[in-house]
């Protein structure tokens, strides 16, 4: 049935092209492909319209677009005009039509391709003239259906109009500019038809006279066919076919099921029946045995699976190397820079931030200080979708050497400069820009990253520079480069005395930094209560107009931010202090755990709704009681290679009454160079990795005798390190020659399990990242400013069975070994003391002499005295040598 035509304003008459006469054997074309086999499109010329009184906009209009035509009139037109008649294509249809009148409909919108169409069945004519009435429910249902329904219109051939594209094609096409010369070569006419004479010829006398086909082994007979076990089942093939039927008359209907139940009489009869009692008595023993088995062990465990996992983890050596996935280089930087710090975005997958600094020594930096002021110091945000253009560029007053995302809100970033200032950024206004990056996609679709050749970089994208919103005070902050920065956990806060209090705000509000000026500073980003109220006139004088593109989140800190407290590491009796380079707090391991990423995402969504950093209030530490059982000790790595375990709490000097730092709890000089990595294990809170100089050490908090593991000197100096995020016994160490040493404590504890070359220059930073359960990456930065993204293989990312317990058992053995060594050291010292006392006793030991021995000794002493006296007198000339007699006689 043809649907009713829509009521629209008339567009006027259309000029129709002349149609060639159809051949006698041409089949009429109907609209069966569109679901209307009874409709046959026609082209009626103006002459035909006048003959049959169906002129457009006169006889047939929008209100009455159809006309009933007598069958005999059509036959008369066919006899008069023959093949020229417009009804000639449907002549066969008209002859087979059972009725006397055919329905001709004006197709104003060319729905079926021509200006008229003929309905060739009585049923179709009745449905068009008398459409079935639609119920009211169906009318209401149709009101909600959009009227703009797509109507298929077959393409109509049109004459080609030149718009100049053929000239471009002719210019790009290659044509021959010179005329070709044709040569025809043939034999002499006299040689045609000459007799042919064949003779023998030596094949070796003429070069290339023959082609030799030497024998060779056919590889088809040497290939080994592998056998494969394939299970087959003889069953008939099943094909799933589904159809979708339109619900013409929808109605609300509900269905409810309920179980069939026994009546009270049947229940009582069944309870007292003997078959039920016998069944319960027989089945109770089997059920009890099954329950006991479930309590004792898991009967459904797959033993073969666990055996295969151990073998596959340590036996599969085909995929053990890091594979380079992508690399990023700042091609727009005019100067040569190195990467100083790397950090993956906590919530947006595929986004990584790096800080860059100029590769200059201290003397060169002072010499070129004027030129360096003209170049921006940046933190670059790279995305996997565009390896050439950074997504964001954070500007800072000077080169950044360390930065961290805020755990409560990833849009807040804190960084430390080379001049000792702390810089704060707020990228909340640009969060939508970096969240809609192609590589990251939606957060629900992150199974695998797309390869590089499927990503389309935005070549015309302009760089987005973001200015910092606050910097610390130059006079009251650090005096030298800031080497490390950390956010304190959102569960606690400290005051100027170092006492720990509960953090009621629920967000991270404090920072800790260490610098080469021998200080460790704690900072609070909340506004501090002024001691004296300021007048409104003074506030107006101090107010500074900020640019419109700089958020006012930390406006109260800009150029007036002072540290909450300072900690100095004294060297004891001397006036010198230790120079810290890296620190590790007790709460740092919480930020490294992989399961905290979902928590970070929920915190991000909450921060977007409430914006807690836009309405910061001063701390409540003065109103709360301090937490006494909180561990305030932390590890510090120094520039001289020392590892110090100290306390951040301050104490008063009994003589001066000033606040001073406590003495370090323990102090060890293990490394022969600057400590640049000190990090807690993400699996063990009390295990710390330190890297510095030419060796690596692993410590346990609470063990003051020394490190659990200390490596021997490496062939090249170590420059960076990081724990694995999924394997407790694996950590990565970067070297100055571009190699990465991969340590696996389950395989080797005295040397790296493997070493792999990554670049040709020094590796400056290492940062792993978990993308999914099947894919992990490790970001490696080098001295030339290139960021290498490496894919971690399966053997280094998937932990083996009971690996955590095995590594923990290894650490416990090392602790016992240290205790044994300490005991042996004390015993040996005691033995040495006893041996020294024994030797001293032997030296001063006196013997008891007899009376005869004492008289003999006195006599010998007296005789030696007389001999000496005689010699002196002879020398003085008092007696002569020739004189005989004893000296006693002379006397």
UniProtKB/Swiss-Prot annotation:
PROSITE patterns, per the entry: WD_REPEATS_1
The protein's assembly and partners: Interacts with ACTR2; this interaction reduces binding of the Arp2/3 complex to the VCA domain of nucleation promoting factors. Part of the multisubunit axonemal dynein complex formed at least of two heavy chains and a number of intermediate and light chains. Found in a associated with the catalytic heavy chain DNAH2, the intermediate chain DNAI4, and the light chain DYNLT1.
Comp. bias intervals (Basic residues): 1-17
Protein's UniProt name: Dynein axonemal intermediate chain 3
Family matches, as SMART domains: WD40
GO cellular component: a single term: cytoplasm
SUPFAM superfamilies per UniProt: WD40 repeat-like
UniProt GO BP: cilium movement involved in cell motility; inner dynein arm assembly; negative regulation of Arp2/3 complex-mediated actin nucleation; negative regulation of cell migration; positive regulation of osteoblast differentiation
Major site of localization recorded for this protein: cytoplasm
Keyword terms: Coiled coil, Cytoplasm, Repeat, WD repeat
Gene Ontology MF terms in the entry: Arp2/3 complex binding; dynein heavy chain binding; dynein light chain binding
Disease: A rare heterozygous in-frame DNAI3 deletion encompassing exons 14-17 has been found in a fetus with encephalocele. Overexpression of human DNAI3 RNA lacking exons 14-17 in zebrafish embryos also results in similar brain malformations, suggesting that DNAI3 defects might be involved in encephalocele formation.
Region (Disordered): 1-22
UniProt superkingdom: Eukaryota
WD repeats: 395-435, 477-533, 670-709, 713-753
Function: Acts as a negative regulator of cell migration, invasion, and metastasis downstream of p53/TP53, through inhibition of Arp2/3 complex-mediated actin polymerization. Via its association with the multisubunit axonemal dynein complex, is potentially involved in the regulation of cilia function. May play a role in osteogenesis of dental tissue-derived mesenchymal stem cells.
Induction of synthesis: Up-regulated at the transcriptional level by TP53.
Subcellular localization, as worded in the UniProt entry: Cytoplasm
Coiled coil: 818-861
């Amino acid at each position: 049935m043809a649907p009713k035509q829509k009521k629209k304003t008339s567009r006027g008459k259309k000029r129709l092209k002349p149609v060639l006469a159809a051949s006698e054997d041409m089949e009429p074309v109907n609209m069966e492909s569109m679901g209307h086999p009874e409709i046959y499109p026609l082209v009626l010329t103006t002459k035909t319209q006048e003959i049959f009184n169906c002129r457009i906009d006169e006889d047939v209009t929008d209100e009455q677009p159809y006309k009933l035509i007598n069958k005999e009139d059509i036959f008369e037109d066919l006899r008069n005009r023959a093949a020229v008649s417009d009804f000639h294509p449907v002549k066969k249809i008209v002859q087979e039509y059972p009725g006397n009148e055919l329905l001709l409909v004006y197709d104003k919108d060319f729905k079926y391709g021509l200006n008229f169409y003929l309905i060739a069945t009585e049923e179709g004519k009745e449905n068009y003239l008398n459409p079935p009435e639609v119920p009211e429910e169906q009318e209401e249902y149709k009101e909600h259906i959009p009227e703009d329904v797509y109507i298929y219109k077959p393409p109509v051939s049109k004459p080609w109009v030149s718009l100049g594209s053929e000239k471009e094609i002719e210019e790009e096409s290659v044509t021959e500019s010179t005329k070709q010369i044709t040569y025809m070569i043939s034999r002499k006419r006299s040689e045609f038809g000459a007799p042919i004479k064949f003779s023998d010829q030596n094949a070796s006398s003429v070069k290339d006279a023959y082609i030799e086909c030497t024998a060779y082994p056919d590889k088809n007979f040497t290939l080994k066919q592998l056998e494969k076990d394939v299970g087959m089942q003889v069953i008939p093939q099943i094909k799933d076919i589904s159809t979708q039927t339109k619900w013409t008359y929808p109605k609300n209907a509900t269905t409810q099921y309920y179980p069939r139940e026994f009546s009270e009489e049947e229940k009582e009869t069944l309870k007292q029946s003997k078959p039920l009692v016998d069944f319960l008595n027989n089945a109770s023993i089997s059920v009890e045995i099954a329950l006991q088995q479930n309590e004792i062990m898991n009967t459904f465990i797959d033993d073969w699976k666990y055996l295969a996992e151990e073998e596959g983890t340590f036996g599969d050596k085909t995929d053990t190397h890091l594979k380079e996935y992508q690399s990023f280089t700042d091609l727009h930087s005019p100067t040569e820079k190195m990467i100083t710090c790397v950090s993956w975005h906590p919530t947006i997958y595929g986004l990584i931030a790096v800080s860059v600094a100029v590769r200059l020594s201290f003397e060169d930096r002072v010499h070129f200080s004027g030129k360096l002021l003209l170049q921006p110091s940046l933190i670059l945000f790279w995305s996997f979708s565009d390896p050439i253009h950074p997504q964001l560029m954070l500007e800072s007053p000077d080169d950044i050497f360390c930065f961290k995302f805020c755990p409560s809100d990833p849009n807040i970033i804190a960084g430390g400069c080379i001049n000792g200032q702390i810089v704060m950024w707020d990228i909340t206004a640009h969060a939508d820009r970096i969240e809609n990056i192609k590589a990251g996609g939606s957060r629900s679709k992150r199974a695998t990253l797309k390869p590089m050749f499927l990503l389309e970089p935005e070549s015309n994208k302009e760089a987005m520079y973001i200015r910092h919103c606050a910097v610390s005070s130059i006079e009251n902050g650090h005096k030298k480069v800031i080497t490390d920065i950390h956010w304190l956990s959102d569960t606690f806060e400290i005051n100027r005395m170092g006492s720990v209090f509960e953090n009621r705000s629920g967000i991270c509000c404090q920072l800790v930094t260490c610098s080469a000026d021998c200080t460790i500073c704690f900072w609070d980003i909340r506004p501090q209560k002024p001691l004296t109220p300021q007048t409104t006139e003074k506030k107006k004088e101090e107010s500074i107009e900020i640019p419109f593109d700089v958020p006012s989140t930390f406006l109260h800190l800009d150029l007036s931010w002072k540290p909450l407290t300072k900690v100095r590491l004294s060297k004891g009796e001397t006036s010198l202090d230790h120079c810290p380079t890296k620190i590790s707090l007790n709460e740092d391991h919480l930020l490294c755990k992989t399961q905290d990423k979902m928590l970070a995402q929920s915190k991000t969504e909450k921060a977007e709704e409430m914006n807690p950093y836009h309405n910061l209030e001063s701390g409540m530490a003065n109103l709360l009681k301090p937490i006494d059982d909180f561990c305030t000790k932390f590890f510090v790595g120094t520039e001289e290679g020392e590892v110090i375990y100290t306390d951040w709490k301050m104490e008063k000097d009994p003589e001066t009454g000033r606040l001073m730092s406590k003495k370090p709890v323990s102090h060890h000089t293990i490394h022969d160079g600057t400590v640049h990595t000190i990090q807690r294990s993400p699996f063990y809170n009390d295990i710390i990795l330190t890297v510095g100089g030419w060796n690596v050490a692993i410590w346990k908090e609470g063990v003051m005798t020394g490190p659990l593991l200390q490596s021997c000197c490496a062939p090249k100096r170590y420059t960076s390190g990081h724990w694995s995020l999924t394997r407790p016994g694996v950590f990565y160490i970067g070297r100055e020659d571009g190699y990465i040493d991969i340590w696996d404590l389950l395989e080797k504890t005295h040397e790296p399990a493997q070493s792999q070359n990554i670049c040709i220059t020094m590796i400056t930073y290492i940062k792993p990242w978990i993308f999914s359960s099947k894919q992990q990456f490790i970001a490696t930065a080098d001295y030339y400013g290139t960021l290498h993204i490496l894919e971690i293989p399966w053997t280094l990312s998937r932990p083996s069975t009971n690996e955590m317990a095995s590594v923990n058992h290894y650490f416990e053995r090392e602790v016992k070994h240290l205790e044994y060594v300490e005991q042996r050291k004390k015993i040996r010292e005691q033995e040495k003391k006893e041996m020294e006392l024994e030797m001293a006793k032997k030296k001063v030991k006196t013997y008891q002499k007899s009376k005869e021995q004492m008289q003999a000794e006195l006599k010998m002493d007296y005789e030696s005295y007389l001999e000496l006296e005689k010699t002196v007198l002879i020398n003085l000339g008092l007696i002569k040598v020739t004189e005989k007699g004893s000296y006693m006689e002379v006397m």
